[in-house]
C-alpha cells in the first residue's frame, strides 16, 4: 500500500493557535476553545508544508500495526497519564508559567501504571532514554489488541490473527472515485498507523452500521488525498471548508517530506463537526471480500464472514451498508 507518514506524536496545527475563553464546541464541559490565527506556525514552515501531501483527517481512534508474539498485531492507542498528585502539581505549574516543557517530571513515580506490554510511541521526545511527556502531560503509546478483548472489542472485530488480515477501507485501486472495503494482510500494514472508524467510535460521525449490526473498519492514515486545495491562508481554507463538497471533512493532515505531520481541524477555524452529510459518504463503495483462498472457515459472527456474504456488491455510500444478512 502507498505509505505516507505515521502518527507517532501529537500533531501541531498548521497555524499559530490562541486560546479563547469561550465554551468549546469540540469538548463538552471545556470552558475554552483553541482557534487558529492567520499566521502559519514555525513548525509548518520548517517542515515545508507548502510542498506537503494534503490528506483528509478521518475521525476515529488511532491504531498502529507492529509485531507482537512473532506476528503483525493491531495496537490500540493508550497514553500514560499522570497520577492525581502529579497532575495537580502540573496544572498548578501551568497557571504560573507558560511553558509546559519547563516542568520537571519523575517518570518512575508521577504516572499511572500501564500494562507490561505497553510501548511508547516511536517519535516522542526522550531524555536519558526515557520518554518525555508532551505539553498535556501525557506520554503517547500503544497496547496490543488481543483476540476477543473486551476492552478493545471494536478493535479486535476488524482483525483476524489466525488469517493475518485486517478489514480496511480505502480507494478502489482502479477507480479513485470509488471506495473499497477489503481484507488486507496485516503484513502489508506493518509500521503504519490507521484510524479505526465505525458505529461505536467517537460518536459515529459517518453514520456507519447500527446498534444491532455494528460496523467498523480501519483506514490507513493518508489514504484519502485532498485535491485542489486553496492557498494556505486562513480565510481561503475557511471558505473551502464551508463552500465545497470536498470540504465536508473533519480536517486536513499535511504529510511533509521530512515525515512531519501538520494538521488543521474544522474547530480551529470555528466550524462545526460532525456534519449531517460528510464527503466520505458522497462516494460509492464496493465490497471486495472473497475469502475462498482461506482454507478454514471464519466465525459466522465475524465481520469478515458477514462482508463475504455481500462480496462484489456496490452501495451508493458507506452509511447504506447493512449487515442484516
UniProtKB/Swiss-Prot annotation:
Enzyme Commission number(s) of this protein: 6.5.1.3
GO function terms (MF aspect): ATP binding; RNA ligase (ATP) activity
Keyword Cell membrane found: no
The keyword Ligase is annotated on this UniProt entry: yes
Description of post-translational modifications: AMPylates itself (auto-AMPylation).
Top-level taxonomic group: Eukaryota
Gene Ontology biological process terms from the UniProt entry: hematopoietic progenitor cell differentiation; response to reactive oxygen species; RNA repair
Keywords: ATP-binding, Ligase, Nucleotide-binding, RNA repair
Coiled-coil region list: none
Obligatory cofactor(s): Mg(2+); Mn(2+)
Enzyme class: ligase
Function, as annotated: Functions as an RNA ligase, in vitro. The ligation reaction entails three nucleotidyl transfer steps. In the first step, the RNA ligase reacts with ATP in the absence of nucleic acid to form a covalent ligase-AMP intermediate and release pyrophosphate. In step 2, the ligase-AMP binds to the nucleic acid and transfers the adenylate to the 5'-PO4 terminus to form an adenylylated intermediate. In step 3, the RNA ligase directs the attack of the 3'-OH on the 5'-phosphoanhydride linkage, resulting in a repaired 3'-5' phosphodiester and release of AMP.
PANTHER family listed in its UniProt record: CHROMOSOME 28 C12ORF29 HOMOLOG (PTHR31219), RNA LIGASE 1 (PTHR31219:SF2)
Name of the protein described by the UniProt record: RNA ligase 1
Amino acid at each position: 500500500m502507498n505509505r505516507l507518514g505515521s502518527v507517532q506524536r501529537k500533531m501541531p496545527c498548521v497555524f499559530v493557535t490562541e486560546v479563547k475563553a469561550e465554551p468549546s464546541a469540540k469538548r463538552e464541559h471545556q470552558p475554552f476553545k483553541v482557534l487558529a490565527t492567520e499566521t502559519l506556525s514555525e513548525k509548518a514552515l520548517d517542515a515545508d508544508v507548502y510542498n506537503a501531501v494534503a490528506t483528509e483527517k478521518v475521525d476515529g481512534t488511532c491504531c498502529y500495526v507492529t509485531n507482537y508474539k512473532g506476528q503483525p498485531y493491531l495496537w490500540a492507542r493508550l497514553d500514560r497519564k499522570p497520577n492525581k498528585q502529579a497532575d495537580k502539581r502540573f496544572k498548578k505549574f501551568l497557571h504560573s508559567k507558560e511553558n509546559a516543557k519547563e516542568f520537571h517530571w519523575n517518570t518512575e513515580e508521577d504516572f499511572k501504571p500501564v500494562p507490561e506490554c505497553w510501548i511508547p510511541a516511536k517519535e516522542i521526545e526522550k531524555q536519558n532514554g526515557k520518554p518525555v511527556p508532551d505539553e498535556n502531560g501525557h506520554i503517547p503509546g500503544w497496547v496490543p489488541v488481543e483476540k476477543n478483548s473486551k476492552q478493545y472489542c471494536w478493535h479486535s472485530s476488524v482483525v483476524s490473527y489466525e488469517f493475518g488480515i485486517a478489514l480496511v477501507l480505502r480507494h478502489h485501486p482502479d477507480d479513485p472515485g470509488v471506495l473499497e472495503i477489503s481484507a488486507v494482510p496485516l503484513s502489508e500494514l506493518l509500521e503504519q498507523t490507521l484510524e479505526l472508524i465505525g458505529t461505536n467510535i467517537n460518536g459515529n460521525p459517518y453514520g456507519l452500521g447500527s446498534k444491532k449490526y455494528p460496523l467498523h473498519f480501519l483506514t490507513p492514515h493518508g489514504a484519502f488525498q485532498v485535491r485542489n486545495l486553496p492557498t494556505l491562508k486562513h480565510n481561503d481554507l475557511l471558505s473551502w471548508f464551508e463552500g465545497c463538497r470536498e470540504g465536508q471533512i473533519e480536517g486536513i493532515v499535511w504529510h511533509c517530506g521530512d515525515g512531519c505531520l501538520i494538521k488543521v481541524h474544522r474547530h480551529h477555524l470555528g466550524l462545526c463537526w460532525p456534519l449531517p452529510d460528510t464527503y466520505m459518504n458522497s462516494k460509492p463503495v464496493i465490497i471486495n471480500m472473497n475469502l475462498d483462498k482461506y482454507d478454514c472457515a471464519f466465525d459466522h459472527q465475524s465481520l469478515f464472514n458477514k462482508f463475504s456474504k455481500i462480496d462484489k456488491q456496490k452501495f451508493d455510500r458507506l452509511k447504506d451498508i447493512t449487515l442484516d444478512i
